[in-house]
């Protein structure tokens, strides 16, 4: 087994249905076709590896798919196709993930640490360090929903680095703090690096990327544009942003519209076919390529969309439930309703024997 990587992402895509409203989502559930709902492919086939002990930076313009990818790696959201392999006895902590708004900072520390597998005595031993690193004062006793984004980031970062994960996913956590906190975080990340931990670091700050990352992946409107040495990829990305800034307002808009249009028009079947052809070209003797690629695409994915069978079953159960309620309310027996379905909307009339109730003979 190849032990050189800690994270391996293969053919990962992410599709979103762009419903205009909840009502449209509901309508599409009951309709036989959802082809009218526009789709958007946030990721269009990403394959990359993060080696054990390396810090991989993710860069790219706004909306390019960095957070989508880091959330998929963290297991926060599922991919639409592809495999995500996280190697070994590994725990991942994503800074922004898992803070519950209704719980206080203190409660969140305990919850996140418990979820990370720590025992209560272990958490008690760490509590002072986590609290002192986060440095958010009395806000610790307030619900997290009252925190500023900087405070959330401080708390999330502090918990993440103290529960000792093998892999740390840091998504834009350093962009919201002040300089002192930023330096504390950089020192902590450097400590992690020295301990040989694996880090995925998402940032718009090329300076931070240059300081912290061994390699960089440039995500560009849902595709992996380039991956390699930090210096090289950052240089190319700087050239791109310089070129983009040099465009007129109209040209910029046109470029962005074109990129988004590509993401809407992405054809997953064509992409799958392309992967099959590439593999066949590499290994012409392999007769099972199509089945292998299908397994790689869909084998480890739980579909977020309901199959027609399940949809039919859900609707049928719903109808049976409503009928059962109506029969119950109508007072008729099931046999009566089956013989005369109209009874269901005509409640049974109960005739009272007035003589019996009044006791008159
Ligand atoms: N739940 C969702 N429904 C529909 N589209 C979504 C959803 N989440 C993300 N997207 C879209 O996916 C694309 C990628 O978003 P993502 O947040 O991953 O980008 P990013 O590179 O992290 O951006 P930024 O640098 O601004 O944080 C964007 O176009 C975004 O609008």
UniProtKB/Swiss-Prot annotation:
Coiled coil regions, renumbered to chain: none
Alphabetic keyword roster: ATP-binding, Cell membrane, Membrane, Nucleotide-binding, Translocase, Transport
Localization annotation: Cell membrane
A Gene Ontology term for the protein's cellular component: plasma membrane
Top EC class of this enzyme: translocase
Single GO MF annotation: ABC-type teichoic acid transporter activity
Role noted for this protein: Part of the ABC transporter complex TagGH involved in teichoic acids export. Responsible for energy coupling to the transport system.
Subunit note: The complex is composed of two ATP-binding proteins (TagH) and two transmembrane proteins (TagG).
Record's protein name: Teichoic acids export ATP-binding protein TagH
Gene name as annotated: tagH
């Amino acid at each position: 087994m190849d032990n050189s990587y800690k994270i391996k992402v293969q053919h990962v895509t992410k599709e979103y249905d762009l419903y205009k409203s909840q009502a449209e989502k509901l309508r599409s559930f009951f309709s036989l076709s959802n082809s009218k709902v526009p789709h958007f492919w946030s990721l269009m086939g990403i394959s990359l590896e993060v080696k054990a002990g390396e810090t991989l930076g993710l860069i790219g313009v706004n909306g390019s798919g960095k957070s989508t990818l880091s959330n998929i790696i963290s297991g926060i959201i599922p991919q639409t196709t592809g495999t995500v392999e996280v190697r070994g006895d590994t725990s991942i902590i994503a800074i922004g993930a898992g803070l519950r708004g209704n719980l206080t900072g203190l409660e969140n520390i305990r919850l996140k640490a418990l979820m990370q597998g720590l025992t209560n005595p272990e958490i008690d031993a760490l509590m002072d360090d986590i609290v002192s690193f986060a440095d958010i004062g009395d806000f610790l006793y307030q619900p997290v929903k009252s925190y500023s984004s900087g405070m959330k980031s401080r708390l999330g970062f502090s918990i993440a680095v103290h529960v000792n994960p093998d892999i740390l996913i840091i998504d834009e956590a350093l962009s919201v703090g002040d300089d002192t906190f930023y330096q504390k975080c950089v020192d902590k990340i450097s400590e992690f690096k020295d301990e040989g931990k694996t880090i995925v670091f998402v940032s718009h700050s090329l300076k931070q990327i240059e300081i912290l990352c061994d390699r960089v992946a440039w995500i560009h409107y849902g595709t992996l544009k380039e991956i390699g040495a930090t210096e090289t990829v950052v240089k190319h990305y700087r050239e791109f942003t310089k070129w983009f800034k040099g465009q007129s307002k109209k040209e910029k808009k046109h470029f962005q519209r074109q990129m988004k249009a590509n993401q809407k028009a992405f054809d997953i079947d064509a992409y799958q076919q392309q992967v099959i052809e590439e593999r066949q070209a590499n290994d012409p003797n392999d007769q099972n390529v199509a089945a292998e690629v299908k397994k790689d695409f869909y084998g480890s994915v739980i579909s977020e969309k309901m199959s027609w069978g399940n949809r039919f079953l859900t609707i049928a159960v719903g109808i049976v439930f409503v009928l059962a309620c109506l029969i119950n309310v109508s007072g008729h027996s099931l046999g009566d309703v089956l013989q005369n379905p109209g009874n269901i909307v005509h409640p049974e009339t109960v005739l009272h024997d007035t003589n019996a109730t009044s006791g008159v003979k």
